[in-house]
Amino acid sequence: VELCKRMLTYDVPSFRAKWNEQHIENINKPAQSMTQLLVEQPITNGKRQIVYLSALFQEKYPETYKRLTDILDKHNVGYALLKATRDIWCRDYMPVQTASGKLIQFKYDPSYLKNNEKYEASRSNVCEVCKANGIKPTFSDINLDGGNVLICGNRAIISDRVFSENPGRKEEDLKAELSRLLEAEIIIIPAQKDDFTGHADGMVRFVNCDTILGNDRAEEFKYWREKMDKVISTYHLQYIDVPFFYGYKDKAHPEHAIGIYVNYLEVENLIVVPVFGVPGNKDAEAVVKIKEIFPDKIVETIDYNEVALEGGLLNCTTWTLNSFQ
């Protein structure tokens, strides 16, 4: 672990291996090896995918866990649990996978977890998690949450929160290093001022490398809409507006994620969309829109509210990996 901690201060040479040789234990189906599990999954564009969740997710939210894994089982999507995690938001502290299959482990030290004893205690140690699960990534000392990285081929979207999280770096130098590590053109989008995480995956998602979907701009703040429109123009992106809603109040959970549909889970040919069922919801509109955007994919819905109240949704709580064949 100490060696791993020291490695966080610089990049080590890239290490790429087929995922089925990395031996992450599949806790859901302990009799199966990871290789056996992946072989049973359908091949999409030469790769297979598997969904990982923190073992704490099953422990803390057993009903929601069952709802999600029942959907995955229904569509023959493999899943497994990650050991040695301290919170359920595995997207943020697990490595980011590039289009070629490399795993890049960024520093996980977000500002929103600092100066709060409760949050500090729940911050997962990336070195411990990687070691416990047999993961051998390339380490970087760039401070960046996985939920703030969206990759499609040779393009990556990251919000400008990455700059304030790395104050000692020049913006252009940081972009260049991210481009090198992620093997992609870096597209910086504006973070939402009222989102304490500043993550890209709560605002937009890739449909393909030239098209993104995102929260309906007509309902967004003017400052964000204008900056986002500039990004769309600069990078020649098509933006598809998806319904969302503000206004749900819960005094015990002021930073909830209820109302955000774009933080869905996408794996293989399946998209799992959260629906909320609360007053003022736009569940039906959002599901219809997502089905229109992805006519060739299966779209399932799920009640994820008990997790959403804690500030995240499906993409936040899953880590989806490709195994290249």
What are these regions (language model features)?
Residues 4-6, 10-325:
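The feature marks the mature, well-folded catalytic cores of soluble enzymes
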